[in-house]
Amino acid sequence: MSYVLPSLPYSYNALEPFFDEETMKIHHTKHHQNYINNTNSILENTTFSSLPIEELISILNEIILEKKNALRNNAGGHINHSFFWKSLKSGTVLTNDLKIEIEKQFGTIDEFKEKFESVALNHFGSGWVWLVNQNGVLSIVSTVNQDSPLMGKLISNTYGYPIIGLDIWEHAYYLKYQNRRLDYIKSFWNVVNWEEASNRLQK
């Protein structure tokens, strides 16, 4: 089995003016595709090539391969981006259980956003920022490069089931925002798919 590029559930310009069409197209068809190509190449003729990406990521610490670090980066890139595309949608509203849980953990929605933005802005270099469910407690964490919380603490230095995630690699925003990372981070709130996030809270 080879991993394939998932189709986006919207057009490349659907998130304008916050996430621009050119960035979305390059991000999806070039960067994400490259992670998939590399993952398939690394796993070719191994017993791991038939595993769903979620299972592969969850046992990464147990895998013995010469190119394990490259697998970590590229398989992580695949699962992170697959999650990211589903996490974006214009016009959704934060309501119900997720809103209650965020307020319980962080005080207010504005305080939650401020903390998320601070973690994203102060993360050095490339990586991701996540809202995760850690055994029933919502936490904001960051991971380096293409690490995922699903890889577990031994690899990603954190853990939890992702509820929302933001790509803070420069390729995710530089065409539109250049070095204005905070503007990109703040624009994210306009395209968070809160419906998907609420569904993830229930898992």
Swiss-Prot record:
Pfam families: Sod_Fe_C, Sod_Fe_N. Belongs to the iron/manganese superoxide dismutase family. It is an enzyme of class 1 (oxidoreductase). It comes from Buchnera aphidicola subsp. Acyrthosiphon pisum (strain APS) (Acyrthosiphon pisum symbiotic bacterium). GO terms for molecular function: metal ion binding; superoxide dismutase activity. It comes from the Bacteria. Binds 1 Mn(2+) ion per subunit. Mn(2+) binds at H27, H81, D167, H171. The gene is sodA. Homodimer. It catalyses: 2 superoxide + 2 H(+) = H2O2 + O2. This is Superoxide dismutase [Mn]. Keywords: Manganese, Metal-binding, Oxidoreductase. Its EC number is 1.15.1.1. SUPFAM superfamilies: Fe,Mn superoxide dismutase (SOD), C-terminal domain, Fe,Mn superoxide dismutase (SOD), N-terminal domain. Its cofactor is Mn(2+). GO terms for cellular component: cytoplasm. Destroys superoxide anion radicals which are normally produced within the cells and which are toxic to biological systems. InterPro entries: Mn/Fe_SOD, Mn/Fe_SOD_BS, Mn/Fe_SOD_C, Mn/Fe_SOD_N, Mn/Fe_SOD_N_sf, SOD_C_sf. The keyword Cell division does not apply.
